[in-house]
Amino acid sequence: MALVLLEELDYMQQYKEDMSLAKYLFHQGRNFETYDYLGSHFCIEDDQEGFVFRVWAPNAVSVSVVGDFNGWNHQLHPMKKETEEGIWELFVEGLEEFSLYKYAVVAKDGRVLFKADPYAFHSETKEKTASYTYSFKDKFNWTDSDWQKYKENLNAYESPMNIYEVHLGSWKKADDGQFLNYRVIADELIPYAKKLGYTHLELLPLAEHPFDGSWGYQICGFYSITSRFGKPEDFMYLVNLAHEHGIGIIMAWVPAHFPKDAHGLYEFDGQPLYEYQDITKQEHKQWGTRIFDFGRNEIRSFLISNAMFWMEKYHIDGIRVDAVASMLYLDYNRNDGEWRPNIYGGNGNLEAIEFLKILNSTVLTKFPSNLMIAEESTSFPGVTMPPDCDGLGFNFKWNMGWMNDVLSYIEENPINRQYCHGNLTFPIVYACDENFILPISHDEVVHGKRSLVNKMPGEYENKFAGVRNFILYMLCHPGKKLMYMGSEFGQFIEWDYSKELDWFLLKFDAHKKLQTFFSEANHFYLAHSPLWELDCSAEGFEWICHSDHTRNILAFRRLNRAGDELIVLVNFSPVIREDYYIGVPSEGTYKEIFNTDLKKFGGSGIRNRKLPKAKTGQMHGYDQYISVTLPPLSTLIFQPVKQNGMKI
């Protein structure tokens, strides 16, 4: 009995020391597991089970816990102020899991603010705004150890990466139009993505948000997986199943700002707390949202802990950080007089820059095989450089310049494309300045921008040929890849977050064949290392011909580390080009190994069936050339053939 009592005393002493350290590190901006301290947690005190609640509200006069267990009466369960820095605490005996609760925060002006828990693990959704008590203990049995071991040995920079971006609420819906459960989505989405040859899924929305129309980007519950699609353990099932199929999960994450919903982080204790107090930094007026105070220690603990939380609890493989440019610049979408320069007289938000460096260093130290991806739309230097080299420390960045240039090009009538040929060639100039991902994301198929197939000029057949042409060109271009859902089968209308994709289109031959093309092209990409092994190195790409603008043709080589090569020819004209001469680096014969114009893809079936043999003669800087036929609106890939007929 004495031994048991001693063990209990030792445990309590260790518990108090851990809590004391957690408090200290939180206020220092260095507690990156704050979710284990703040929020609601199942525990046992004096042999009584219940939940302990902790919340940070330094400007509050008082705080209490209200919920369905006390009739939402803010006078029944007052919290105790544990620290001068404003952490409040209360143990509620006998409280069961999945109890609804909020914090009733009494502000200095006498208002009673009913706030959802910033650290809640599970929340109500949409019009309902309370938090649930929830414990992760014994909720799910992970079986993804093989994936984790595989990922440990993976060099992401020299591996294929082809991301399928998915909005969970509109990929598919139930027959009655309601949202599907995470498990139901997983059982359909994961095999589908695997069949189509994607390596990763990027999912939105994940964190809890009240408004469907925000697409999940205006978050009130940063630690709550949205309950639109089920419980936390249901989402764990989705991630686990993806890993069992060899597919990584990336989440869209929004540390830049938050909405002004009354139950959320907005002026949490009656005054600006999570947001800047300085009105020149406080708000994104065009979005109607508040900006996190990146220089405040407690906010750094909150946000960095949040990134760690998703990876620790849900085995997320990567984070795509949204709206990075809005964080980096003090004058982002601001007029003169609406912002103040930093201490050096510049427009950089030094606190946000420092925050991003700490974020990436922390995450990639704990999870070195994971991805930290920046959606950054400017030319800010060193986004994917390490912090010790004065970079931000992301390992990849969306190539928004490439995206804008090439989409502008393909939307042009082919007759006029010769005048914007530089849109295709200029991105190669900076292709290795950062570690890039080429994104055709949700932002490019809404708000009048049209779907991918409907961006293409011409008649019906030309639109589909244009998509095939563009996609294989994209797969062969340096950089990892991202494609938004629906593009793979030719969704004609723009994406609508309130409706599922037009899956009925697969009943039509052209759409089914386009889906077949996507699958075969993606699998071809996976199987050929010259298309990805040296994405981040200038050694992986070499122009053959970039100047044939009058005929809308490009030719280039892709190489791997062993020197194996593919020759890519892109014809962005609706005109067939017969006897087209192209310089090649070596003698021998060349074999056409992929052609977007095949009949099984919906094309005309024009092929180079005979193996073109290199002839002696100067062409494009080489001593030999081959003659090939280029179908209209097509991309072709050739490979050198050894003398014995074996491919290199």
Where are each of the predicted segments found?
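Conserved, mostly hydrophobic/aromatic
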Residues: V55, Y103, V166, A193, ...
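The feature marks proteins involved in alpha-glucan
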Residues: M1-Q48, V52, K80-E165, S170-G177, ...
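Catalytic cores of secreted or luminal carbohydrate-active enzymes
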Residues: A510-L531
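Conserved alpha/beta catalytic core and glycan-binding cleft of carbohydrate-active enzymes
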Residues: K126, H315-D317, N335-E500, L505, ...
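Short proline/glycine-enriched turn/loop motifs at strand-loop junctions of beta-rich domains
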Residues: W56-V63, P585-G588
